Each structure stands twice: as C-alpha cells, then as structure tokens.
Regions:
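Alpha/beta enzyme core
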Residues: 3-12, 17-71, 76-98, 102-141
Length: 141
C-alpha cells in the first residue's frame, strides 16, 4: 500500500485514488482544476521562429488530444512570433490555448502575454538581472 501524501489519498485498492481539490482557473476557454478532469498538455519541439513547422506540429499534437500547447520563448523576438503562430492557428479554427514557456527572460514573458493564453515562468528565473531591486518584506507583499 502506498503511503499517504498530503496531496492525495490512496488505499490498498490501486484504483481508489482521490485527487486533491485544486483551485479552478481558466486558460483561454479551457478550465483547469476544480471538478474538471486532469488536462493533457504537450510541449512543441518545432522552433518557435519556424511558423510553418510550429503550426503543422500544433495541428498534429492537438489532433492527438492535447488541450494546451506549450512553446518555448527564449527572447522577445521569439515571444513576438507566438503572435504569428496564434493568429495562424485561429485562422485555421484551432482555439487550443497556447502557453509560452519562459526561462531567464522577464522581457520575453511580458511580450508573450500579448499573444498567448498563459505564460509559464520559473519564479527563480524571473529576477531583476541588473540587481536594482532591493528585496525586503515590503517588496514581497
């Protein structure tokens, strides 16, 4: 029998798993959490700058069942191209929410917000690279 974990309960019966109740949020028109099922997300491997390849891969991933699709966006130029990808997918009738995956570049995250339904950021990477912010309790509030 698996040990109990704060996020779920288990029993001697392997099929008796109970999900932890999560807050309900909407990513585009696709709800996540609450009483909704676990959602399927996939990460694109096509270059985010190669619009044609990115859109073609999105069609394949979504037809396979993905409910969210993540693209990497390393900098502002790449994040801006998410807008082109988003527009082309919508023109083809595909409304699956797009997620920008950001590492080490707050400017790319801010740019991506203009074009996609969600931005995924590693919090430790979203920092003031010039070190101009003085961190204290007031800043964290």
């Amino acid at each position: 029998m698996a040990e109990n974990h704060p996020s779920h309960t288990t029993s001697a019966e392997p099929c008796l798993y109970h999900r932890r109740r999560a807050a309900l949020v909407h990513i585009g028109d696709t709800p996540l959490g609450g009483d909704y099922p676990v959602r399927v997300q996939s990460m694109a491997t096509a270059s985010t700058l190669d619009t044609e390849a990115a859109v073609a891969q999105a069609e394949r991933i979504i037809s396979a069942g993905a409910e969210y699709l993540r693209y990497t966006a390393q900098d502002k130029r790449v994040a801006t191209n998410l807008g082109v990808i988003h527009k082309e997918l919508r023109a083809r009738g595909i409304t699956t929410p797009l997620v920008a995956d950001i590492h080490f570049n707050p400017t790319a995250a801010d740019t991506a917000l203009e074009y996609v339904e969600k931005v995924r950021v590693n919090p430790g990477n979203y920092v003031d690279s010039k070190g101009t912010t003085e961190w204290n309790d007031e800043v964290y509030r």
